[in-house]
A protein has these predicted regions:
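Alpha-solenoid helical repeat scaffolds
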Residues: 1-246, 252-286, 292-310
């Protein structure tokens, strides 16, 4: 179509018309749109809205959509935000929530960004996997990982969010940040079983260490070291050593700490653990020597036997 010709005719008509209705101004804005003269769209749309108000008429939804587009092209996100609020107030639709969220993203307003997602979720407007995953990530950014974990868990159980390594990894991270290691473990197990590298196995080992499940900790740490491709294998060795120490497997624990000590940043901690192990082994050796020489004394016997004897 000949949009420049249309624009020229409109301008001539405006020059002759003393009291135009809103619609011709909207037509003018649409012509500017077709000509990709987006900044020039704003004035006629706002004029149309002003005339509508003066005549006690409501501005139409598509007028606001057109104005929103013009401001978006001009990267005026503050105006985009304001228009989306009007659209939501009068025509609450899913796409307007996400447009509002996009404006908050561009403005760096994380608090209101999450509020927009929350409102969309409360109204049942979140449907797709990426929408729920994005919302969970926003919760974690705002340091409310428990809500992120609950959201992901629910949507994975419903089948909306896929049960893959990436999503299980995110779920486990949310539970761990919420200091819910017992709930992080099932997600970590699922993620680790799907992972090629050993990072998630080591993370799983740390969760087992935190809740005192030392046999499982050893198994997971060894799996991680076996798979390899670890960013910090020394940390994996330290975790393994701590779990072995708690199982009183001092020789194996010492080997793990010796392996970790080969890395400069872990050397001091590892050597401290080695000293603790050596001291514990020596203490046990002295006890055994004393028992062989003198027989058991009350101080060498377990507390429950001493109590029984008394």
């Amino acid at each position: 179509e000949n949009y420049p010709r249309t624009l020229d005719l409109l301008n001539k008509w405006f020059a002759l018309e003393s009291n135009p209705a809103p619609e011709p101004y909207i037509l003018q804005a649409q012509v500017f749109y077709q000509l990709q003269r987006y900044k020039e769209m704003v004035a006629p749309i706002e004029t149309a809205m002003r005339i509508a108000r003066e005549r006690d008429k409501e501005a139409k939804e598509d007028w606001y959509v057109l104005l929103n587009f013009a401001y978006f092209q001009d990267e005026n996100y503050a105006k985009v935000k304001d228009i989306q609020k009007i659209l939501l107030q009068n025509w609450p639709k899913k796409r307007y929530w996400f447009s509002l969220a996009g404006a908050y993203t561009e403005l760096g307003d994380d608090q209101n960004l999450i509020a927009a997602y929350d409102a969309a979720y409360t109204q049942g407007m979140l449907e797709k996997e990426n929408e729920f995953v994005t919302m969970a990530q926003l919760y974690m950014q705002r340091e409310v990982p428990y809500k992120a974990a609950i959201l992901l868990q629910e949507q994975m159980e419903k089948g909306v969010v896929k049960k893959n390594e990436k999503n299980y990894r995110l779920l486990s991270q949310a539970w761990m940040l919420a200091q819910e290691d017992d709930k992080a473990i099932p997600a970590l197990q699922q993620a680790a079983s799907r992972a090629v590298d050993g990072e998630l196995d080591v993370r799983l080992a740390n969760s087992y260490l935190n809740i005192g499940e030392y046999d499982e900790c050893v198994s997971a740490a060894n799996d991680g070291l076996r798979k390899g491709s670890l960013k910090n294998p020394d940390n994996a060795q330290i975790t393994l050593g701590m779990c072995l120490y708690n199982l009183r497997k001092y020789s194996d624990a010492k080997k793990a700490f010796q392996a970790a000590a080969k890395v400069q940043k872990s050397r001091r901690m590892s050597n401290q653990w080695i000293q603790v192990i050596d001291a514990e082994v020596e203490r046990n050796r002295q006890i055994q020597l004393k028992l062989r020489r003198d027989g058991p004394s009350l101080s060498d016997l377990p507390d429950f036997i001493v109590s029984f004897m008394h």
